[in-house]
Amino acid sequence: MTLFPLPSTSDPAEADESTKRGEQARALCLRLLTARARTRAELEAALAKRGYPDDIAAAVLDRLTQVGLVDDEDFAEQWVRSRRLNAGKGKRALAAELRKKGVDNEVIDGALAGIDAGAERTRAEQLVRDKLRREKLGDPDDRDAENKVARRLVGMLARRGYNQTMAFDVVTAELANERERRKV
Protein backbone atom coordinates (compact mmCIF):
# COMPACT_ATOMS: atom_id res chain seq x y z
CA MET A 1 0.00 0.00 0.00
CA THR A 2 1.38 3.38 -1.01
CA LEU A 3 0.77 6.32 1.28
CA PHE A 4 1.52 8.84 -1.44
CA PRO A 5 -0.30 9.21 -4.74
CA LEU A 6 1.97 8.51 -7.65
CA PRO A 7 2.70 11.59 -9.75
CA SER A 8 1.15 11.64 -13.17
CA THR A 9 4.15 10.95 -15.33
CA SER A 10 4.89 8.58 -18.10
CA ASP A 11 8.33 7.73 -16.66
CA PRO A 12 8.03 4.89 -14.08
CA ALA A 13 11.57 5.56 -12.79
CA GLU A 14 10.59 9.10 -11.86
CA ALA A 15 7.47 7.83 -10.09
CA ASP A 16 9.54 5.30 -8.14
CA GLU A 17 11.99 8.04 -7.14
CA SER A 18 9.14 10.24 -5.87
CA THR A 19 7.69 7.36 -3.84
CA LYS A 20 11.13 6.56 -2.46
CA ARG A 21 11.67 10.21 -1.43
CA GLY A 22 8.25 10.22 0.25
CA GLU A 23 9.12 7.13 2.26
CA GLN A 24 12.46 8.66 3.25
CA ALA A 25 10.72 11.85 4.37
CA ARG A 26 8.20 9.85 6.38
CA ALA A 27 11.01 7.84 8.02
CA LEU A 28 12.85 11.06 8.92
CA CYS A 29 9.72 12.55 10.51
CA LEU A 30 9.03 9.39 12.48
CA ARG A 31 12.63 9.30 13.70
CA LEU A 32 12.37 12.94 14.84
CA LEU A 33 9.02 12.27 16.53
CA THR A 34 10.52 9.30 18.38
CA ALA A 35 12.87 11.63 20.26
CA ARG A 36 10.15 14.10 21.29
CA ALA A 37 6.89 15.62 20.09
CA ARG A 38 7.38 18.30 17.43
CA THR A 39 5.30 20.95 15.75
CA ARG A 40 4.39 20.82 12.09
CA ALA A 41 6.65 23.83 11.47
CA GLU A 42 9.63 22.06 13.09
CA LEU A 43 9.11 19.02 10.88
CA GLU A 44 8.67 21.21 7.78
CA ALA A 45 11.96 22.93 8.59
CA ALA A 46 13.75 19.59 9.07
CA LEU A 47 12.46 18.30 5.74
CA ALA A 48 13.36 21.53 3.93
CA LYS A 49 16.84 21.48 5.48
CA ARG A 50 17.41 18.03 3.99
CA GLY A 51 16.16 19.12 0.57
CA TYR A 52 12.78 17.41 0.33
CA PRO A 53 10.40 19.06 -2.17
CA ASP A 54 7.47 20.99 -0.72
CA ASP A 55 4.86 18.69 -2.25
CA ILE A 56 6.40 15.58 -0.69
CA ALA A 57 6.83 17.33 2.67
CA ALA A 58 3.22 18.52 2.63
CA ALA A 59 1.92 15.03 1.77
CA VAL A 60 3.97 13.41 4.55
CA LEU A 61 2.95 16.01 7.14
CA ASP A 62 -0.71 15.86 6.12
CA ARG A 63 -0.66 12.09 6.59
CA LEU A 64 1.09 12.36 9.99
CA THR A 65 -1.47 14.97 11.06
CA GLN A 66 -4.30 12.76 9.83
CA VAL A 67 -3.15 9.80 11.96
CA GLY A 68 -2.58 12.07 14.98
CA LEU A 69 1.22 12.02 15.21
CA VAL A 70 1.49 15.75 14.53
CA ASP A 71 -0.89 17.93 16.55
CA ASP A 72 0.18 21.50 17.34
CA GLU A 73 -2.60 22.03 19.90
CA ASP A 74 -1.63 18.94 21.87
CA PHE A 75 2.05 19.88 21.57
CA ALA A 76 1.38 23.39 22.92
CA GLU A 77 -0.60 22.09 25.90
CA GLN A 78 2.08 19.54 26.78
CA TRP A 79 4.85 22.12 26.31
CA VAL A 80 3.13 24.63 28.61
CA ARG A 81 2.47 22.00 31.28
CA SER A 82 6.02 20.67 31.16
CA ARG A 83 7.85 24.01 31.04
CA ARG A 84 5.74 25.51 33.84
CA LEU A 85 6.30 22.51 36.08
CA ASN A 86 9.97 21.79 35.35
CA ALA A 87 11.42 25.18 34.40
CA GLY A 88 9.00 27.51 36.20
CA LYS A 89 8.35 29.56 33.05
CA GLY A 90 5.82 32.38 33.00
CA LYS A 91 3.21 33.07 30.32
CA ARG A 92 5.36 35.49 28.35
CA ALA A 93 8.32 33.10 28.10
CA LEU A 94 6.07 30.18 27.18
CA ALA A 95 4.40 32.18 24.42
CA ALA A 96 7.80 33.19 23.02
CA GLU A 97 9.04 29.59 23.06
CA LEU A 98 5.92 28.34 21.27
CA ARG A 99 6.14 31.12 18.66
CA LYS A 100 9.76 30.14 18.05
CA LYS A 101 8.60 26.57 17.42
CA GLY A 102 6.11 27.76 14.80
CA VAL A 103 2.85 27.39 16.73
CA ASP A 104 -0.02 29.68 15.62
CA ASN A 105 -1.05 32.52 17.94
CA GLU A 106 -4.60 31.14 18.38
CA VAL A 107 -3.18 27.79 19.50
CA ILE A 108 -0.78 29.57 21.88
CA ASP A 109 -3.63 31.60 23.38
CA GLY A 110 -5.63 28.41 23.90
CA ALA A 111 -2.74 26.64 25.60
CA LEU A 112 -2.04 29.59 27.90
CA ALA A 113 -5.72 30.18 28.74
CA GLY A 114 -5.52 27.66 31.58
CA ILE A 115 -2.94 29.74 33.45
CA ASP A 116 -4.55 32.39 35.62
CA ALA A 117 -2.72 35.27 37.29
CA GLY A 118 -3.07 33.70 40.73
CA ALA A 119 -1.42 30.47 39.64
CA GLU A 120 1.37 32.39 37.96
CA ARG A 121 1.98 34.45 41.09
CA THR A 122 1.96 31.32 43.26
CA ARG A 123 4.57 29.71 41.01
CA ALA A 124 6.72 32.87 41.16
CA GLU A 125 6.49 32.88 44.97
CA GLN A 126 7.54 29.25 45.09
CA LEU A 127 10.55 29.91 42.83
CA VAL A 128 11.67 32.89 44.93
CA ARG A 129 11.18 30.95 48.18
CA ASP A 130 13.29 28.06 46.89
CA LYS A 131 16.03 30.43 45.75
CA LEU A 132 15.97 32.45 49.00
CA ARG A 133 16.54 29.33 51.09
CA ARG A 134 19.97 29.05 49.45
CA GLU A 135 20.79 32.77 49.63
CA LYS A 136 22.91 34.39 52.28
CA LEU A 137 20.99 37.49 53.32
CA GLY A 138 23.49 39.15 55.60
CA ASP A 139 22.72 42.13 57.85
CA PRO A 140 19.10 43.36 57.59
CA ASP A 141 20.29 46.98 57.90
CA ASP A 142 22.59 46.68 54.85
CA ARG A 143 20.33 48.06 52.10
CA ASP A 144 22.94 47.49 49.36
CA ALA A 145 23.12 43.76 50.09
CA GLU A 146 19.33 43.56 50.28
CA ASN A 147 18.95 45.41 46.96
CA LYS A 148 21.53 43.14 45.35
CA VAL A 149 19.59 40.02 46.39
CA ALA A 150 16.31 41.61 45.27
CA ARG A 151 17.75 42.56 41.85
CA ARG A 152 19.09 39.04 41.38
CA LEU A 153 15.72 37.49 42.23
CA VAL A 154 13.72 39.91 40.06
CA GLY A 155 16.14 39.17 37.21
CA MET A 156 15.64 35.43 37.68
CA LEU A 157 11.87 35.85 37.41
CA ALA A 158 12.17 38.20 34.42
CA ARG A 159 14.32 35.66 32.55
CA ARG A 160 11.60 33.09 33.16
CA GLY A 161 8.99 35.35 31.61
CA TYR A 162 7.29 36.88 34.65
CA ASN A 163 5.94 40.42 34.63
CA GLN A 164 8.45 42.81 36.25
CA THR A 165 5.90 44.50 38.52
CA MET A 166 4.63 41.19 39.86
CA ALA A 167 8.22 39.92 40.19
CA PHE A 168 9.19 42.94 42.29
CA ASP A 169 6.11 42.57 44.52
CA VAL A 170 6.75 38.84 45.01
CA VAL A 171 10.44 39.35 45.78
CA THR A 172 9.73 42.13 48.29
CA ALA A 173 7.12 40.06 50.12
CA GLU A 174 9.20 36.87 50.10
CA LEU A 175 12.34 38.69 51.30
CA ALA A 176 10.37 40.04 54.26
CA ASN A 177 8.95 36.56 54.98
CA GLU A 178 12.39 34.96 54.79
CA ARG A 179 13.92 37.55 57.13
CA GLU A 180 11.08 36.90 59.59
CA ARG A 181 11.55 33.14 59.28
CA ARG A 182 15.29 33.41 59.95
CA LYS A 183 14.76 35.55 63.07
CA VAL A 184 13.05 32.69 64.85
Swiss-Prot record:
Any Gene Ontology biological process: regulation of DNA repair
Keyword Metal-binding: no
Keyword presence, Cytoplasm: yes
UniProtKB keywords: Cytoplasm
Residue ranges the record marks as coiled coil: none
Annotated compartments: Cytoplasm
A single cellular component GO annotation: cytoplasm
Gene3D superfamilies: Winged helix-like DNA-binding domain superfamily/Winged helix DNA-binding domain (1.10.10.10)
Stretches the record annotates as Disordered: 1-21
InterPro entries in UniProt: RecX_HTH_1st, RecX_HTH_2nd, Regulatory_RecX, WH-like_DNA-bd_sf
Family assignment from sequence similarity: Belongs to the RecX family.
Function: Modulates RecA activity.
HAMAP family according to UniProt: RecX
Protein name: Regulatory protein RecX
Name of the encoding gene: recX
